[in-house]
């Protein structure tokens, strides 16, 4: 079957429930769609109250369709053929389309929407006229109003007529950014990218905070984390990647805290740093990939001791999931194979052999009195480096910009 499409009609998901904020949600979804399709300048994207329209202008439909299936906030979309707003031409194009898509034994239905009320026929008359032309040209034609094999949608707009027959399922959820901004603690593991994905699905715009401890962690580990952030851009556009210099803090903790408390105190410092970054950059929540009971720092006792350093809400999207459930999502969003690459992050490099599973808060506070907590956090926050990850080829763009600078 060869059908050349001219436009894609996008239908919104949960936006129908958003009342007075509907316009904001629609504009944000349109922005996200434009970002995801930014390298295809021939596209023209228009968003209106109940749907968005993407004029292809010769762009590769298959590539556009593949990207749209991942954008949160889209319920479904339909590729359309644009034809002249004239009954003889509409009939001719309907017959030509049915020759491509309609087979003996199938049922069909015509569903017309008339946005141009000055058109010569109303919706009912159009349904009858186009149904008749199908019967006239296909002896085996059989109409069925409920759940037909093919529903031909005909939309009469001011500029032209649009024919469509496919509904492609979107990602659902809410447009990224409509729930505000959150800061994702992105390691190089399996869990945190999945947590980021699930936060994106509910409309949270994420900035990815990654703790790097050179020379203990390698440039490869840093690139891996950026590549993981890039995998998440397909769901709603560019992500700001925030690299935190963490070497001083980890060396100080290792020198001044008992081995059993290294992990707990390290996580407390991470929480302090990410909370400061969140505050400075207008975030509302902290997001991490903790899964209850998976490792020593993710018991209820450990989480309680770590959380004590902040009053900011901490969202843990995968907290109740089994590892297999998390892996299933990681494979679905194409982060799993990256996550299992053998680069150590700052937590694994300094991990003690027998960490406390139920650390006492008073002990954490006592050990931290040996350190310049505020000064260390200040220096880490002042040393952050920001990178805009605008797609999976972010490193090529970075190289091109560097070459231009030279």
UniProtKB/Swiss-Prot annotation:
One CC-aspect GO term: cytosol
Annotated compartments: Cytoplasm
Record-linked InterPro entries: Rossmann-like_a/b/a_fold (IPR014729), ThiI_AANH (IPR020536), ThiI_fer (IPR054173), ThiI_N (IPR049961), THUMP_dom (IPR004114), THUMP_ThiI (IPR049962), tRNA_STrfase (IPR003720), tRNA_sulfurtransferase_ThiI (IPR050102)
Reactions accelerated catalytically: [ThiI sulfur-carrier protein]-S-sulfanyl-L-cysteine + a uridine in tRNA + 2 reduced [2Fe-2S]-[ferredoxin] + ATP + H(+) = [ThiI sulfur-carrier protein]-L-cysteine + a 4-thiouridine in tRNA + 2 oxidized [2Fe-2S]-[ferredoxin] + AMP + diphosphate; [ThiS sulfur-carrier protein]-C-terminal Gly-Gly-AMP + S-sulfanyl-L-cysteinyl-[cysteine desulfurase] + AH2 = [ThiS sulfur-carrier protein]-C-terminal-Gly-aminoethanethioate + L-cysteinyl-[cysteine desulfurase] + A + AMP + 2 H(+)
Enzyme class: transferase
SMART domains: THUMP (SM00981)
Keywords for this protein: ATP-binding, Cytoplasm, Nucleotide-binding, RNA-binding, Thiamine biosynthesis, Transferase, tRNA-binding
Major subcellular site: cytoplasm
UniProt record similarity statement: Belongs to the ThiI family.
Role, per record: Catalyzes the ATP-dependent transfer of a sulfur to tRNA to produce 4-thiouridine in position 8 of tRNAs, which functions as a near-UV photosensor. Also catalyzes the transfer of sulfur to the sulfur carrier protein ThiS, forming ThiS-thiocarboxylate. This is a step in the synthesis of thiazole, in the thiamine biosynthesis pathway. The sulfur is donated as persulfide by IscS.
Protein name: Probable tRNA sulfurtransferase
Native source organism of the sequence: Lactococcus lactis subsp. cremoris (strain MG1363)
């Amino acid at each position: 079957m060869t059908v050349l499409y001219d436009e894609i009609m996008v239908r919104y998901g949960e936006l129908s429930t958003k009342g007075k904020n509907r316009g904001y949600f629609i504009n944000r979804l349109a922005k996200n769609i434009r970002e995801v399709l930014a390298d295809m300048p021939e596209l023209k994207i228009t968003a209106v109250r109940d749907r968005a329209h993407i004029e292809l202008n010769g762009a590769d439909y298959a590539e556009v369709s593949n990207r749209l299936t991942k954008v949160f906030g889209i319920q479904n979309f339909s590729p359309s053929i644009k034809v002249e707003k004239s009954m003889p031409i509409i009939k001719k194009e309907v017959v030509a389309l049915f020759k491509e898509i309609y087979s003996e034994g199938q049922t069909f239905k015509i569903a017309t929407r008339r946005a141009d009320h000055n058109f010569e026929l109303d919706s009912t008359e159009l349904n009858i006229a186009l149904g008749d032309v199908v019967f006239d040209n296909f002896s085996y034609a059989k109409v069925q109003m409920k759940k037909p094999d093919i529903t031909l949608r005909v939309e009469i707009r001011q500029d032209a007529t649009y024919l469509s027959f496919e509904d492609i399922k979107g990602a659902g959820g809410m447009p990224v950014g409509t729930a505000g901004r959150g800061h994702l603690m992105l390691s190089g593991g399996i869990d945190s990218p999945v947590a980021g994905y699930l936060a994106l699905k509910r409309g949270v715009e994420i900035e990815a905070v990654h703790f790097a401890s050179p020379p203990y962690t390698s440039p490869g580990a840093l690139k891996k984390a950026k590549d993981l952030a890039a995998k998440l851009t397909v769901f709603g556009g560019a992500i700001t990647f925030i690299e935190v210099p963490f070497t001083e803090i980890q060396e100080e903790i290792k020198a001044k805290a008992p081995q059993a408390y290294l992990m707990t105190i390290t996580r407390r410092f991470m929480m302090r740093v990410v909370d400061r970054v969140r505050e400075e950059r207008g975030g509302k929540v902290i997001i991490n990939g903790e899964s209850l009971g998976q490792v020593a720092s993710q018991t209820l006792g450990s989480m309680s001791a770590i959380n004590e350093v902040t009053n900011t809400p901490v969202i843990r999207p995968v907290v109740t999931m089994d590892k297999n459930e998390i892996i299933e999502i990681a494979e679905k969003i194409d982060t799993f194979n990256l996550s299992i690459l053998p680069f150590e992050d700052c937590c694994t490099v300094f991990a003690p052999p027998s960490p406390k599973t139920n650390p006492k808060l008073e002990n954490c506070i006592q050990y931290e009195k040996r350190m310049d907590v505020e000064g260390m956090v200040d220096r880490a926050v002042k040393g952050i480096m920001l990178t805009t990850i605008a797609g999976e080829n972010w490193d090529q763009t970075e190289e091109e910009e560097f070459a231009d600078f030279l």
